[in-house]
A protein has these predicted regions:
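Ankyrin-repeat boundary/"N-cap" motif
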Residues: 324-333, 359-375, 401-407, 434-435
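Ankyrin repeat domain, specifically the short helix-to-loop turn at the C-terminus of the second helix
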Residues: 314-322, 347-355, 362, 389-397, ...
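The feature represents the membrane-entry module of six-transmembrane cation channels
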Residues: 1-344, 348-349, 358, 378
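Extended amphipathic alpha-helical coiled-coil/heptad-repeat regions
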Residues: 357, 370, 377-381, 390-394, ...
Length: 435
């Protein structure tokens, strides 16, 4: 069960307005799909505004589509109208029924087929396109520059208002770099990762994330990518953009944590509270958020028992009543501690004889995580090196089978964690274990 302090705090919260929205949000300009489908060249925001093509999006107009993409040149997003031509043909094909959106192969194998968007959802009469070059001021005047900065800061709000988040990534050559851009290169860009994070952290219910690789090849994005593609570890043309990214991501995480509390989604709150440093803050100059719940008090003197004090604080902010009880989703405290890379709390739990191999009982399907994950498996997939080292020193079982039949070595590979793989192999993880 959840602790009384967590339940009381959630009950006391007033309706929390999204902290990334508000009076400073730039207008959400979109292009109606009817006008978009008639385009033969990419014109910038100011030209479209002067021509009366842009609309101020409102949900009463229909559904919006956020287009995330890489620019095909240093000065223009799509100089030869190649990228957007693919999106035009994609929309026409889906509506005509000559192309359909497939599910990510791995999630379909594991969890079965799920409902995707219907062709009618893309009917041009009620679809509106958000695209950076259309929707954000591009000129160099002072007013446009201020508007551009505000619009960029408003991207999480735009993403949250869009039913569709489209990764537009056909294989096309960059005009200046002479390399081919693709879905893989999109995933390497820091800003693209931030836009993806904005979708994951939005408070919107429903919607779809669609990868468009050609006019006849579209698929739903696999959720497992978020476990290894932190925004700060992406590539940036300007390293100073990391400061912008840090502010945006911090606001998004705070907003989502409060959303989970307001809606009493306490497991999701714990998951994000403990995982956000690895998933979203890594490689950014940010301090992790270590708690929101007020009213912490304990009789433990931190100068006498630092580990015990930190353990009590951890339990309080996670809304856990004791060190042995699982939450409603089947996750024990030791797994949350491993997720946050909190080695002080991990050691305190081990000192109190908590089972080091205690595993989750339910899967996290939205992130394609299986049931029966141990603290070692969780620390491995999140690349929490210090937690992995501590758990291995404490003799965690390296070949414990998770719900997919794999071990911590499999999760380390899934998290793109070469250091973890090396540590686990040194600890004699079974490289031949089959899932």
């Amino acid at each position: 069960m959840d602790s009384a302090s967590l339940v009381q705090f959630a009950s006391a919260l007033h309706k929390h307005q999204d902290s990334i929205a508000g009076s400073n949000t730039f207008v959400m300009y979109t292009v109606p799909a009817d006008a978009f489908l008639q385009m033969t060249e990419v014109k910038m925001h100011e030209e479209l505004a002067d021509a009366g093509v842009l609309t101020e999006f409102d949900e009463s107009l229909g559904k919006a589509m956020f287009v995330s993409h890489q620019w095909l040149s240093a000065t223009h997003p799509d100089p030869d109208f190649q990228q957007l031509k693919v999106l035009q043909d994609t929309l026409r094909n889906i509506v005509a029924g000559t192309s359909s959106i497939s599910q990510a192969l791995f999630s379909e194998i594991v969890y079965g087929r799920r409902r995707g968007p219907a062709p009618g959802d893309f009917a041009s009469g009620h679809l509106h396109i958000w695209y950076d070059y259309f929707s954000i001021p591009q000129s160099h005047g002072g007013r446009a520059s201020r508007g551009r900065q505000t619009a960029i800061q408003s991207i999480p709000t735009y993403v949250a208002r869009c039913e569709f988040f489209v990764v537009l990534c056909p294989a096309l050559k960059h005009k200046d770099q002479k390399r081919t851009l693709s879905h893989a290169s999109w995933g390497e860009r820091g800003w693209c990762r931030t836009e993806r994070a904005a979708r994951e952290l939005s408070t919107r219910k429903g919607g779809y994330v669609i990868v468009v690789e050609s006019a006849t090849h579209q698929s739903l994005l696999w959720g497992g990518l978020s476990m290894r593609d932190a925004p700060g570890e992406g590539e940036f043309t300007l390293d100073g953009d990391r400061v912008w990214i840090g502010r945006m991501v911090t606001q998004m995480v705070w907003s989502k944590l409060f959303y989970y509390l307001e809606h009493r989604q306490f497991h999701n709150y714990r998951f994000l509270l403990n995982a956000h440093a690895a998933l979203y803050f890594r490689a950014l100059d940010l301090e992790p958020i270590d708690g929101l719940v007020p009213g912490f008090h304990t009789e433990i003197d931190p100068s006498v028992d630092c580990k015990g004090f930190m353990l009590e604080r951890f339990l309080h902010h996670n809304g856990l009543r004791n060190i042995f009880e699982r939450d409603a989703a089947g996750w024990p405290p030791i797994c949350f501690a491993a997720m946050s890379n909190n080695v002080v709390v991990l050691q305190a739990l081990l000192d109190r004889k908590v089972d080091i191999n205690q595993a989750t009982t339910k899967p996290a399907t939205e992130l394609t995580l299986p049931a029966k994950l141990t603290a070692l498996g969780i620390a491995s997939i999140l690349r929490n090196k210090e937690a992995v080292e501590l758990l291995l020193r404490a003799r965690a079982q390296v070949n414990y089978k998770d719900g997919f039949g794999g071990n911590a070595l499999h999760t380390a590979c899934g998290g793109d964690n070469p250091r973890g793989v090396r540590l686990l192999c040194d600890a004699r993880a079974n490289v031949n274990q089959q899932s």
